[in-house]
């Protein structure tokens, strides 16, 4: 069973233990309901805390069970949430790191919620062509307001816990912990406090009982529906999110839940949903390398050097600047360097002008950028990426020089799209550190990153580059040294 049950004094703690993100698979769901039953039958237990072990509270559904009978087998998530609501003893969700999809819906079914600062909160189902299917569209508007909830549900984007806690009148969090480290103790303290408050039979607070209205009613939803329609690119799910949240303001809670479930099941059968789920699963599969375990040690990459300030070099640099990683660009001539930096600056200024980037973020990113005309100045970089002319003689000169100046353990990457990475690696005395990182043009826009594994590329180098790809928000796909 992938949920752990322990009693700490007079509080039962149910810890989700289904790495990597505590997906709510069948075994985990059974563990939660069994834990709730055990706690309610133990006279010594006065309150219950549900939390997540490892790196997440819960990332939602267990993708390993997508499309299998286990995904809907009882207790399904709706039943688990109902068990939380019906608990005779207060249930506190202690949320940290990530609470997404079904994980957030589970927390919304608890009587109280405390979150660590920096926790990512989201209902991302729209990105799979769906709407939340376990009460998210009905409960979230009741705790943060209709507009804030609809923005989250339609976009599917994550918002940090401390930002949500600042919303006027929010009832999503009863407390924000001082830190992730102090969350367990603060959750126990909250559980004991609310247990004392309910000792005399005070009814449990249920999100489902909170009011849900919007002052502009129909006019607001029609405006929102029109706006979403223009942005949805013919995908049905965003518009259906609006319908479901509108139902939360007009229907009784149970009727709204039925309406949400009907929409969810109908969307599951659409070609758009099937396609988006296929893309999601393919993206996940592409990140897994059979002979490179997930726990393979990775090298620290805290600084990057890019050789070449042209179109590719500038675009590559922006990816790392966007991720908060310092970049030093090397060129042979000052005018080429100046043109490259000017292009980067122009690209960022265009984003600022369009309102896509705040001025302070622009300033932060440009402050991370430095330049040089000397190889000697890049030797301490953790990763160096060459983006020079696509000719083997040029690559040979570059990599022989990198072999001389780069510190031990630095990763030497080539942006080549056609040349032999094994041949390039042979120009160095450290072929285990050489790898291909083929960005597609424009490199700061295109999502795909082709990671070319040479015959002698180290597993730690490959694992590191795949992790870097994720950090700079690329879809990384491993290829061999071959055509195609």
Question: Which residue stretches match the model-derived regions?
Answer:
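Glycine-rich beta-to-alpha active-site loop
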Residues: 83-133, 158-160, 308-316
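Conserved N-terminal Rossmann-fold NAD(P) cofactor-binding segment
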Residues: 334-382, 392-397
């Amino acid at each position: 069973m992938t949920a752990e049950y322990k009693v700490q004094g007079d509080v039962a703690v149910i810890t989700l233990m289904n790495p990597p993100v505590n997906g709510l698979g069948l075994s985990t769901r059974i563990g939660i309901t069994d834990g709730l039953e055990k706690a309610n039958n133990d006279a010594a237990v006065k309150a219950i805390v549900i939390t997540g072990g490892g790196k997440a509270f819960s990332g939602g559904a267990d993708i390993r069970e997508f499309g299998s009978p286990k995904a809907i087998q009882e207790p399904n998530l709706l039943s688990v949430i109902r068990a939380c609501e019906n608990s005779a003893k207060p249930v506190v969700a202690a949320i940290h790191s990530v609470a997404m999809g079904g994980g957030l819906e589970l927390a919304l079914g608890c009587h109280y919620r405390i979150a660590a600062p920096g926790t990512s909160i989201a209902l991302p189902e729209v990105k799979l062509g769906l709407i939340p299917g376990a009460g998210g569209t009905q409960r979230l508007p009741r705790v943060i307001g209709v507009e804030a909830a609809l923005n989250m549900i339609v976009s599917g984007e994550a918002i940090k816990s401390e930002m949500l806690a600042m919303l006027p009148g929010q009832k999503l969090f009863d407390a924000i912990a001082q830190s992730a480290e102090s969350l367990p103790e603060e959750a126990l303290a909250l559980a004991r406090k609310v247990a004392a408050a309910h000792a005399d039979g005070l009814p449990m607070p249920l999100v489902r009982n909170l009011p849900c209205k919007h002052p502009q009613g129909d006019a607001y939803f029609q405006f929102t529906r029109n706006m979403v329609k223009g942005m949805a690119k013919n995908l049905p799910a965003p518009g259906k999110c609006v319908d479901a949240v509108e139902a939360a303001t007009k229907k009784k809670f149970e009727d709204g839940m039925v309406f949400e479930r009907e929409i969810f099941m109908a969307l599951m059968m659409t070609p758009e949903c099937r396609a988006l789920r296929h893309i999601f699963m393919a993206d996940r599969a592409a990140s897994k390398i059979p002979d490179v375990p997930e726990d393979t040690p990775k090298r620290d990459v805290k600084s990057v050097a890019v050789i070449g300030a042209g179109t590719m070099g500038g675009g590559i640099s922006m990816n790392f600047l966007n991720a908060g990683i310092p970049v030093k660009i090397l060129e042979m001539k000052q005018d080429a360097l100046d043109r490259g930096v000017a292009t980067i600056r122009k690209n960022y200024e265009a984003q600022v002008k369009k309102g896509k980037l705040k001025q302070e973020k622009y300033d932060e990113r440009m402050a991370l950028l430095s330049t040089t005309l000397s190889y000697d100045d890049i030797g301490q970089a953790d990763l160096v990426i060459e983006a020079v002319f696509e000719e083997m003689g040029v690559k040979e000169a570059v990599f022989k020089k990198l072999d001389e100046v780069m510190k031990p353990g630095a990763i030497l990457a080539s942006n080549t799209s056609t040349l032999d990475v094994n041949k390039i690696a042979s120009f160095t005395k450290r072929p285990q550190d050489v790898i291909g990182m083929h960005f597609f043009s424009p490199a700061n826009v295109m999502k795909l990153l082709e990671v070319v594994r040479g015959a002698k590329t180290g597993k730690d180098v490959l694992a590191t580059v795949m992790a870097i790809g994720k950090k700079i928000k690329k879809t990384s796909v491993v290829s061999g040294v071959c055509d195609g």
